[in-house]
Amino acid sequence: MSNSMISKHSKSAFDESESIRILEELLESTREIKTFFSENDRTPNYDGTFELVNNECEPVKQFIVQIKKVDKLIQNTKGKNIGKYDYSLKTNFLQYVKDKVTECPAIYFVVDLSTKKVFWIYLSDETLMRLNFEGKKTVTYHFQETEFISDINSFILESSRIHLKNHALAN
């Protein structure tokens, strides 16, 4: 045991780095997404961006992201949310997206460090309304088994659909 007065790195700082590495490796595995994530940063509201890229690696669409880590999400074994994973979403990012501070589509990622599963929510206007979060610091979200990235190609396809839908709405 050290008697040093030097500040120490927290377990949380290492866990944050691990969660970002897990997410970056997954998203960039096909070279169709390029990530720009920050760790140990003090930027309010979001943790970075990722870009969908075309065959020439030109950016096609940028998404903003919030990345949260959890030691282990527990699957509900009883009640109305049986089979789902409860997570307490912090609402500051939700409010940031709802207030249209950015026009980029927004994704809320939750990385389960024990299983290395990456859960995600696309924060569409409909999703934000359904979450009913205003005036609250957190809101419980019930992740379904289908709301984690089990196949990166499916996630890329869904991200492309989000981009095309947003593009059509803007025109």
Task: Give names to the regions the model predicted.
Residues 1-44, 50-171:
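Mixed-charge (Asp/Glu-Lys/Arg
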